[in-house]
Amino acid sequence: MRPAFAVGLVFAGCCSNVIFLELLARTHPGCGNIVTFAQFLFIAVEGFLFEANLGRKPPAIPIRYYAIMVTMFFTVSVVNNYALNLNIAMPLHMIFRSGSLIANMILGIIILKKRYSMFKYTSIALVSAGIFICTFMSAKQVTVQTGLSDKDGFQAFAWWLLGIAALTFALLMSARMGIFQETLYRQFGKHSKEALFYNHALPLPGFIFLASDIYDHVVLFNKSELYQVPVIGVTMPVMWFYLLMNVVTQYVCIRGVFILTTECTSLTVTLVVTLRKFVSLIFSILYFQNQFTMWHWLGTSFVFIGTLMYTEVWKNLGTTKSELQKDDKKD
């Protein structure tokens, strides 16, 4: 029952989160910083109350290690959200971030000296090809935007290239953070809720450098049209409602993933998250009518088939959690 509940949280929370993020980004494309700040603040306050016990509970992992992890986590979060300001469409944003397997494999080979089977290399090649197809076709769409002069078209394409560079950097940094977390958990034990709190609480002072941009968007949000919230009947600017729902659904999504990691194998978690991304992508395309050609569909299918191949879903479908843990120990 608990794993099924967690899967429900992941699909409901994460899919809804993408919807509200796109509603925010479509109205104010530069709102990435205020969205990131709101998410960090909400999770930090919740963690301070219920995980850190109002600051009375000492951390199991030394703060100096969290400082390193937090620097990486803060950078990844800000860069990923800021990429939406750089002509990156939401579907491409989701597809590109699905390339985390590639980044993990590359850094695993370089840093941890890991070696993989030819089957896994094939699956990663498939994911890479899918991302390349989607990125290339999106580039063509940027360069042929109607109503733009040659100068404006080149400028839009240049910003798009910067957005791709930002997503690539965030992808590699996120993979490096995952390896760092893996070494910490091996040394100090798994403390996922504690890590979640410190990863969101410690970076809060860093938002001082983004205060001007955040304040500008507070003013813009205040000027948005009024919206009456169903059921409770409270009236508020619609952009604040979108932001509130984005923050709440982000928390639900993270909690669902956390429960899954404690109840299921990493294979199951990867499969659920992958399927969730696919559902979010389909909804974004259909509901928001984002441009998506047959080439995009081909690239997307490559990404998701490659991901499923990498996790060896068909091979391990009937394998129990204890058996997988035994296999992990052998490796």
UniProtKB/Swiss-Prot annotation:
Name by which UniProt lists this protein: Nucleotide sugar transporter SLC35B4
Protein task: Antiporter that transports nucleotide sugars across the endoplasmic reticulum (ER) membrane in exchange for another nucleotide sugar. May couple UDP-alpha-D-glucuronate (UDP-GlcA) or UDP-alpha-D-xylose (UDP-Xyl) efflux to UDP-alpha-D-glucuronate (UDP-GlcA) influx into the ER lumen, which in turn stimulates glucuronidation and excretion of endobiotics and xenobiotics.
Residues that span the membrane, as ranges: 4-24, 30-50, 59-79, 92-112, 124-144, 153-173, 201-221, 229-249, 251-267, 268-288, 294-314
Membrane topology category: Multi-pass membrane protein
One GO term (biological process): regulation of gluconeogenesis
MF GO annotations: UDP-N-acetylglucosamine transmembrane transporter activity; UDP-xylose transmembrane transporter activity
Organism taxonomic ancestry: Eukaryota, Metazoa, Chordata, Craniata, Vertebrata
The reaction(s) this protein catalyses: UDP-N-acetyl-alpha-D-glucosamine(in) + UDP-alpha-D-glucuronate(out) = UDP-N-acetyl-alpha-D-glucosamine(out) + UDP-alpha-D-glucuronate(in); UDP-alpha-D-xylose(in) + UDP-alpha-D-glucuronate(out) = UDP-alpha-D-xylose(out) + UDP-alpha-D-glucuronate(in)
Family: Belongs to the nucleotide-sugar transporter family. SLC35B subfamily.
One Pfam family per UniProt: UAA
Domain of life: Eukaryota
Keyword Nucleus recorded: no
GO cellular component: endoplasmic reticulum membrane; Golgi apparatus
Cross-referenced InterPro entries: SCL35B1-4/HUT1 (IPR013657)
Record keywords, A-Z: Endoplasmic reticulum, Membrane, Sugar transport, Transmembrane, Transmembrane helix, Transport
Localization of this protein: Endoplasmic reticulum membrane
Motif (Mediates endoplasmic reticulum retention): 326-331
